Regions:
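C-terminal edge strands of extracellular/lumenal beta-sandwich accessory domains
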Residues: 29-47, 66, 85, 93-103, ...
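Sec-dependent signal peptide cleavage junction
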Residues: 18-33
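A short beta-strand element within beta-rich, extracytoplasmic domains
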Residues: 75-84, 202-211, 329
Length: 329
């Protein structure tokens, strides 16, 4: 069994201010340790949530496993460092979440020797107490006995998606007037957020991203859950070359209405790129109430008042109902 040399981190917390809700990074100092073989989930090397860890793959069949358990919700950033070489060989780095007896793949990244010496992997929207694994294996043979370094950084915050949030039942809860950061970790990843309206009014949604001259991007779909059905309200394609702040069609919300925002791929080049989803709520009785696409579900229109609406898609219809009141005699 080969020896494993890596650098572990003794974490020391630096609190930035005392404001509730501010993300608090955790900083650390380095300590060197020797660890025996870590070629399975059961023998995975335990990593602190902040640190720098170096190792090598001893042969073409060698695999290295690492395990992390965050002590709070937040963002787990992972960087993979190596020395440049003029070769297409390298490493395959896979991240997993252990949940309900299964190892759920979050991301799978191939890093070649000729790639940048510091590669940022898709971040993990981590949950307190959950177990996460990093698996490193060879991508062809030239990376054998070449040192790599895994660096992890953890930011405590409630404003990050919580993987796995790829279904309605596991959606990340998004409070009113809040901002969340997420990323699509792989080609099949889906991120779903749930919003419960605190009253009648307008839920304005913006999708923010970093500009790139690229036609790939994200597909953002908004649903209302009512009567056991998920009713599509809008469906938008946002390319990386679109405006960095993209205004989605707003939701004409009803009190205690349940709404979902679903984010999927539009082609694949945006894998691992961060996006920001922001909602702003304006309570008011003078916005349409979706779904109001039939006579039966028409929004009541009060005489003498100004009401606002929007057509969220090519198929959207808005119905308004006016009830004539008899004059007093």
């Amino acid at each position: 069994m080969k020896k494993k040399l890596y650098s572990a981190i003794l974490a020391s917390i630096m609190v930035i201010g005392s404001i509730c809700g501010v993300a608090i990074p955790v900083y650390a100092k380095e300590e060197t340790k020797i660890i025996d073989g870590n070629d399975s989930y059961d023998t995975a090397t335990y990593l602190d949530i902040n640190g720098s860890y170096s190792d090598v793959l001893a042969d073409s069949d060698d695999v290295d496993f690492y395990k992390l358990t965050p002590d709070s919700n937040g963002k787990l950033s992972i960087h993979f460092g190596h020395t440049y070489g003029d070769s297409s060989d390298g490493w395959e780095v896979i991240t997993y979440k252990y949940q309900d007896g299964e190892y759920l793949e979050l991301s799978d990244t191939v890093i070649q020797l000729k790639d940048n010496e510091n590669i940022e992997l898709p971040f993990v929207g981590a949950q307190q107490g959950c177990k996460y694994y990093i698996k490193v294996k060879g991508y062809y043979g030239d990376a054998v006995n070449k040192k790599y370094t895994i660096k992890t950084t953890f930011t405590r915050s409630e404003q990050y998606e919580k993987e796995e949030n790829n279904s309605y039942s596991s959606a990340t809860e998004m409070g009113m007037n809040s901002t969340y950061t997420g990323t699509l970790n792989n080609k099949s990843d889906v991120d779903i957020y749930r919003i419960i309206s605190s009253g009648d009014g307008k839920i304005a949604l913006t999708f923010e991203h970093t500009y790139a001259e690229d036609s790939s991007g994200w597909n953002v779909i908004i649903y209302r859950y009512a009567n056991g059905e998920y009713q599509e309200l809008s469906n938008e394609i946002i390319e990386q070359k679109d405006s960095e702040v993209y205004q989605l069609p707003y939701i004409g919300a009803v009190s205690n209405g349940v709404y979902y925002v679903k984010i999927t791929h539009y082609y694949w080049e945006e894998i691992g790129k961060e996006y920001v989803l922001r909602n702003t709520f304006l309570q008011s009785g003078y916005y349409e109430k979706e779904e109001n696409d039939s006579y039966k579900t028409a929004t009541d229109l009060m005489v003498g008042k100004v009401h606002n609406g929007t057509l969220n898609s090519n198929n959207d219809k808005d119905f308004w109902k006016i009830t004539r009141r008899r004059p007093h005699t």
